[in-house]
A protein has these predicted regions:
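Metallo-beta-lactamase
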Residues: 58-59, 66-68, 153, 160, ...
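Boundary at the C-terminal end of the N-terminal hydrophobic targeting segment
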Residues: 27-28
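C-terminal regulatory/interaction regions
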Residues: 264-306
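Conserved beta-strand hairpin/beta-sheet module of binuclear metal-dependent hydrolase folds
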Residues: 32-77, 177-189
């Protein structure tokens, strides 16, 4: 996955809603743990966000961090469960920085749950254009062993956990995981509050899919829902709404231009990225990926695509 980070700017504070999110204490910064409820914690020591739910039957995790941060992740998790025994690990998508410790957890008995497309991408050599190479398949032990296509649910420690498919938003295998009773919604990289949104067009993502996925998330959430992205701070529903509206504005500004033959420089000159409620570190990269994704879904652009 490409590590293109940037800061959200220009969003008026009143849009952030009334939900007060917990601040990271010095202890939280040291341990990499941020308590969201008495049983649910955000773990940041893995390089990307890992959500950990402590149940009597073992931990339920959402994502497993970056490959080079596994030791730090395990150290943090021991504060929640000394034996770091995981019952279930959800993968929100296939990218290595979010699934780096998969093999460790599966070898220790965890079931890895993901969309079937995520398993397929992990099992397949994948072209990495920024690195000019193919990424080899992941080991069998690192791949999900329980996959689904639409949605599902489970219970852990009296907590209802719902999960479902988010079609072609960041990859072709994105899912959400909703801790219903705790009102905490993990969305992977379908939300991107702290770096450039990535449209991994090579594995199926496009901006129309991202808008649709965010609309589904907004229907699940309420004003008190804490939304956990794959990287960056916990979000409110109001903040997710702002990001969704930015994506929809860009879609509206670009879909006709792409159909008519515009490329990145043309769209930048036309100001398609101007006046938005966030900035980009690399707008050219974002528009390049947007362009590729739109053409991959050209049948959805207009009946008269040439």
């Amino acid at each position: 996955m490409l590590d293109r980070r940037q800061l959200m700017t220009g969003v008026v504070a009143s849009l952030f809603g009334s939900l007060v999110l917990p601040r990271r204490s010095a202890a939280a910064q040291q341990t990499g743990l941020l308590a969201l409820t008495d049983r649910l914690s955000l773990v940041t020591s893995g390089g990307t966000n890992v959500l950990a739910f402590a149940s009597p039957d073992g931990l339920v995790l959402v994502d497993s961090g970056a490959p080079d941060r596994s030791d730090a992740l395990m150290t943090s998790l021991r504060a929640l469960a000394p034996d770091v025994r995981a019952r279930t690990l959800f993968n929100t998508h296939w990218h290595a920085e979010n699934t780096g410790a998969n093999q460790i957890f599966r070898q220790n008995g965890a079931a890895i749950v993901a969309h079937e497309n995520t398993r397929l991408w992990m099992a397949t050599p994948t072209w990495m254009p920024d690195e000019d190479r193919y990424r080899p398949p992941r080991t069998k032990e690192a791949q999900p062993d329980k996959t689904f296509y639409a949605d599902g649910a489970m219970t852990a420690g009296n907590e209802r956990i719902e999960y479902g498919y988010l079609i072609e938003a960041h990859t072709s295998g994105d899912i959400y995981v909703f801790f219903r009773d705790s009102n905490v919604l993990a969305v992977g990289d379908v939300a991107s509050p702290a770096r450039d949104p990535e449209l991994d067009y090579l594995t199926g993502a496009w901006i129309g899919g991202r808008v649709d996925a965010m609309d589904r998330l907004l229907k699940l959430a309420d004003a008190n829902t804490r939304i956990v992205p794959g990287f960056g701070p916990v979000m409110t529903r109001a903040q997710l709404q702002v990001e969704r509206d930015v994506m929809k504005t860009i879609y509206d500004r670009t879909v006709d231009r792409v159909r008519e033959g515009d490329y990145v420089e043309d769209m930048l000159k036309a100001g398609v990225m101007n006046g938005l409620a966030r900035t980009w570190k690399d707008p050219k990269k974002f528009l390049h990926d947007l362009h590729k994704g739109l053409w991959a879904h050209h049948n959805k652009l207009d009946a008269n695509v040439v």
